[in-house]
Amino acid sequence: MEWETVIGLEIHAQLNTKSKIFSAASTQYGQKPNSQACAVDLGLPGVLPVLNVEVINKAIKFGVAINAHINQRSIFDRKNYFYPDLPKGYQISQMDRPIVGEGKIEITFDDQTKIVGITRAHLEEDAGKSMHDMFDDDTAIDFNRAGIPLLEIVSEPDMRSAKEAVIYAKKIHALVQYIDICDGNMQEGSFRFDANVSIRPKGEKELGTRTELKNINSFKFLERAINLEVERQQDILEESGSIVQETRLYDSVKHETRSMRSKEETNNYRYFPDPDLLSVEISNELLEKIRQTLPELPTQKKARFVSELGLSDYDADVLTLQKPLADYFETMLEHHASNAKLCANWIMGELSASLNKHKIDIQNSPITAQALSLLISRISDDTISGKAAKDVFKAMWNSEGNADEIIQAKGLKQMIGMGEIEAIVEQVIANNARQAVQFKLGNDKIFGFFVGQIMKLTAGKANPKQVNELLRNKLF
């Protein structure tokens, strides 16, 4: 039987505020356990939550960016459940009236444009963190994360493959960084996924029983986890079994999913409005003010790169998918380099390869955008060849100096004088008269032999374009 996969994502984006959603405690990452948890975060008796207004503004900003409906009257609810890292016995979230209502995101997959619906985006507080590896027989709990503001972005079940889900997740990841509401740092847990996965016979309309995959913090793991779950469900159904609606944990080390608990329905959480918090009233003036603060969005930047800079759709898509990458590219253009295509090629080629090899983010690259732009300009003005530029790049990566200093020190400057190159071309042709005759008789492959001999005699310093031009003139 042929199966169709149905996927919806719940993305948890930590909002980049300095204090927590309902307390003044710091949100700084990596501090000593339980050093940033105040009485409100710990749910101690007699304390009351105070809403951080900045989280409202950031949620609205996201909603405006995706052209979503904004609920101008929004309320907070208590989501009741027991877990050791939830000290109050409930989580403050939003159920019936979230800040952000229906919206949509456009993705491109296999050269096809597709709309993924967004059901809602609601605010909630994060829970603490259970730490199982600190003690042999006990679990420790760090409440520093408790109360961190989250924007949970819930999609419609519109995706039909793991690859589609990853493309959508990357779009959201780029967007929250561009509008500066989340740093998107997945290593620190600032951007996490839950995936709701089901399958059904191809052509059927009714959805299958879904499972929720948790503990996913990278695009690679998201794709792996979904594919693994799809295979598991197919195996069960093809053996006449039935899928259990449950929450499953993805283990990236063992590459498996395992059951955590049966999947709760909404009524299991006994949602009700939080009596300690007033409703949030959003004025038209505030909406317009936030709309005016929106920066150039990824889709807009991509369109500009294509129309104004002449980049291909693919190149523009790659460069705009991560804000730091787009910023690096534009900084290059602001300095020495003016050839946008050449800049793009070097960022996506040599630079990306080196960053990936050394597992470094572009923000921490040892070669700054200004430094790389100088190297690109030396290629553009024919000071060095493309081959020599790769040697200069390696030296720059190893902090041996800037492009001009390395070119000078290594003697990599090309021979610019046509007269000097012409003399060498004539010498090579004279020394290889038999090959010259073969070329004139139609053996085009001999041309590469002549180029190689010339580059050898010039130690690679001859300008390849000038060599080709002179060689063709002399041979013909």
Curated annotation (Swiss-Prot):
<dbReference type="InterPro" id="IPR042114">
    <property type="entry name" value="GatB_C_1"/>
</dbReference>
<dbReference type="GO" id="GO:0050566">
    <property type="term" value="F:asparaginyl-tRNA synthase (glutamine-hydrolyzing) activity"/>
</dbReference>
<dbReference type="GO" id="GO:0050567">
    <property type="term" value="F:glutaminyl-tRNA synthase (glutamine-hydrolyzing) activity"/>
</dbReference>
<dbReference type="GO" id="GO:0070681">
    <property type="term" value="P:glutaminyl-tRNAGln biosynthesis via transamidation"/>
</dbReference>
<dbReference type="GO" id="GO:0006412">
    <property type="term" value="P:translation"/>
</dbReference>
<keyword id="KW-0547">Nucleotide-binding</keyword>
<dbReference type="Pfam" id="PF02934">
    <property type="entry name" value="GatB_N"/>
</dbReference>
<protein>
    <recommendedName>
        <fullName>Aspartyl/glutamyl-tRNA(Asn/Gln) amidotransferase subunit B</fullName>
        <ecNumber>6.3.5.-</ecNumber>
    </recommendedName>
</protein>
<comment type="function">
    <text>Allows the formation of correctly charged Asn-tRNA(Asn) or Gln-tRNA(Gln) through the transamidation of misacylated Asp-tRNA(Asn) or Glu-tRNA(Gln) in organisms which lack either or both of asparaginyl-tRNA or glutaminyl-tRNA synthetases. The reaction takes place in the presence of glutamine and ATP through an activated phospho-Asp-tRNA(Asn) or phospho-Glu-tRNA(Gln).</text>
</comment>
<keyword id="KW-0648">Protein biosynthesis</keyword>
<dbReference type="InterPro" id="IPR006075">
    <property type="entry name" value="Asn/Gln-tRNA_Trfase_suB/E_cat"/>
</dbReference>
<dbReference type="Pfam" id="PF02637">
    <property type="entry name" value="GatB_Yqey"/>
</dbReference>
<keyword id="KW-0067">ATP-binding</keyword>
<dbReference type="InterPro" id="IPR003789">
    <property type="entry name" value="Asn/Gln_tRNA_amidoTrase-B-like"/>
</dbReference>
<dbReference type="InterPro" id="IPR017958">
    <property type="entry name" value="Gln-tRNA_amidoTrfase_suB_CS"/>
</dbReference>
<dbReference type="InterPro" id="IPR018027">
    <property type="entry name" value="Asn/Gln_amidotransferase"/>
</dbReference>
<dbReference type="InterPro" id="IPR023168">
    <property type="entry name" value="GatB_Yqey_C_2"/>
</dbReference>
<comment type="subunit">
    <text>Heterotrimer of A, B and C subunits.</text>
</comment>
<dbReference type="GO" id="GO:0005524">
    <property type="term" value="F:ATP binding"/>
</dbReference>
<dbReference type="InterPro" id="IPR004413">
    <property type="entry name" value="GatB"/>
</dbReference>
<dbReference type="InterPro" id="IPR014746">
    <property type="entry name" value="Gln_synth/guanido_kin_cat_dom"/>
</dbReference>
<keyword id="KW-0436">Ligase</keyword>
<comment type="similarity">
    <text>Belongs to the GatB/GatE family. GatB subfamily.</text>
</comment>
<dbReference type="InterPro" id="IPR017959">
    <property type="entry name" value="Asn/Gln-tRNA_amidoTrfase_suB/E"/>
</dbReference>
